[in-house]
Amino acid sequence: MIRSHVDVVGSLLRPAELLAAQKKFAAGELQPADFKKIEDRAVDQAVTLQEEAGLEIVTDGEMRRQSFQAQMTAAVDGFGEHTLDAFLWGQWHGDQATGDWSLARPVALGVVGKLRRRRHLSAEEFTYLRARTRCIAKITLPSPSLWVNFWSRQHSSHAYPTLESFLADVTEILCEEVAELARLGATYIQMDAPHYALLIDPATQGFYEQQAAQGGHSASVQQWLDRALELDNAVISAAPAVTIGLHLCRGSQASRWLAEVSYEPIAPTVFRKNSRLTGFCLTTMMCARDHSNHCGRFPTISWWYLA
């Protein structure tokens, strides 16, 4: 018997009140306590929406984040000044209604100092969410190797001479975060890895090869993938009792997508080397490229979610 499994994988749309408040807060026109109340209301609305839809697992809609991975840069010193473009750059593909859209990688993007955590990334998100629902509260965290984007030989080498040394500190912070969430009672964490599809897309894989070369070593796509999965497994091992789901997608922003490839080339490695995972969340709706049966690559996995 197949049991259906439904939960929210990405961010929910921010309500107009929150969008307006974010602008006012950034401009210094709104006090932190007042801004927090508006964020809280947005989370409450997101929880109600999911509960009324009958979901057994709910998120806070990532209402408190600039982007799905931005809780890292918000809680950790060393990333330097950056805008939302740091998370959105790339060649985005669209359909006839949305069209393509391009954004160059910011030239100043790059970690500028040793990473130092000022506070936990998602502990506050989790404790607030847990207090607002009787459902399972899910928190999302980024895969460590997603942060390859934030290393630059020009801007980062004085703090992190190699890309590997930077990723080691990122991984340590995420391990500490998973352990703290488990201590607080979290039972389900989603690890977001949209960059895995970019590793095999001919239009984007060159960036990762270039980052490796500038970071002190050469790396093929397979070597990149193997190392990325090692870092994932390190984070997962920080809380063995917590359910971890790996989310793969091709990027999703304003009904556009970044990668246009099948998961097939990476399926054997991803599905078999992430042996500590409980499940996978595979987003397939943005670009219909997947006709093969990926689930057959790893028949012992507890559950799959196909969006």
Question: What are the residue ranges of the model-derived segments?
Answer:
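Domain-level signal for soluble alpha/beta catalytic cores
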Residues: 1-307
